[in-house]
Amino acid sequence: MAPARTEDSGLPVARLADLLLKHIYFKSPMQAKDWAAALCLPYQTVTPAIQSLVEQGWCQTIGRMAGPTLSHDFGESLGYLITDPGRLRARDVLARDHYVGPAPVPFLQYEESVRAQVSQADVTAAWLTRALQHLTLSPDLLVQLGPPVNARAPLFLYGAPGNGKTTIAEACAELLGEPIYIPYAIDIEGQVMRVYDPLHHQRVQRQLPMNFDARWVLVKRPFVKAGGELTTAQLSPSFDPLMRYYEAPIHLKANGCIFLLDDFGRQDSSPRALLNRLIVALERRVDYLTLAGAGMAVGAPFEAMVVFSTNLEPGSLVDEAFLRRVRYKIHVPDPTPVEFLQIFQRACKEFEIVFTEAGYNYVLDRYYKPFKRPFRGCQPRDILNQLDEVAYFLGRPPRLDADLIDLACRSYFVQA
């Protein structure tokens, strides 16, 4: 619910005044209604802050002003201009931080929101099967996946590349409930930390209540993936020395759903260092973040399911004591011959290529059996995609003809 009074916003009048001053410094004059909207707050909530700016001589009214939105309220329709003393004051405020955006949400409100929006959805076998129906997986693997997803427990997915580990983790994210609300930014003892990130958060277009607090964004439960580029530094708030505010660490952006450490063991930081950094958060659902620029630390809520995906044996990455902290370790095996056939047939339908037993057997006899090549779940789709592109280039219909198979496979397999 949108805060009706200044105190309901969780921010003092002086803080709101500074935020307003930064906005009007870059865009002057401004109509009162749109000035308040820049902070994503109702006009009546910021009225005391506007009055404070006028009383101190940092802004002045210029009478009624036409704005982008029509207002029938006299106060909302007033226009304001920043004064010369106001510009000097704004520069002082900007020297502290360059954050110009929606008013941040108090940290306590953020913490309460994260805890309140922990998914309570019970994942049934039927739900899991439906979510993974686009993959060909054994019933045994589905049974193994159910308990950790239900418990939102840390999970190791390991096995050869190309068998769907990342896709499995992504599909599980769809099971963890309805969209959630996250703030654009949070206020931690006067320090601003941006939380909403369009790279990781997908907005949900839905009619929201009239009195909705616009400082919050409705997003799909986030599936946040970090690959080989991940370092321990990215698991701490990043402070921009130029802008002088913080960006939330990547795993905190996954609150409410899944944080995937993809290709675990290939990062610049060692597996042990990464696990050491995350172990408290995994066990206590709290991560202690250091705000280096402010010389302070805060215990932030961490309510994400952590999935480690690796092509390596978990035992080769960390010792037994660490493995004990990640109770669920599930091997994603190569497809069986029957499963590989099913995957191939499904890929044929996707590319509208008529499946023939002769063509399929040619692939196996020519490119698998002589090399004792293991089956991988990604291969049928990759091969047929390549065959489809070759056929298009040659002006031929895509079919499981031996020459088209040869052209596709020779450019796909290193050893062919």
Language-model features, listed with the residues they occupy:
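A short helix-turn-beta junction within AAA+ P-loop NTPase domains corresponding to the substrate/partner-engaging
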Residues: 277, 318-334
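Short acidic, hydrophobic short linear motifs in intrinsically disordered regions
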Residues: 26-38
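Dynamic helix-loop-helix/coil hinge segments at AAA+ ATPase domain boundaries and subdomain interfaces
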Residues: 113-142, 370-371
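Interdomain "pre-motor" coupling segment immediately N-terminal to P-loop NTPase/helicase cores
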Residues: 49-120
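Short alpha-helical segments that sit at the start of domains
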Residues: 1-19
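Conserved AAA+ ATPase small/helical "lid" subdomain
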Residues: 344-405
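C-terminal engagement/docking regions of AAA+ P-loop ATPases
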Residues: 401-416
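Conserved ASCE/P-loop NTPase catalytic core
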Residues: 129-307
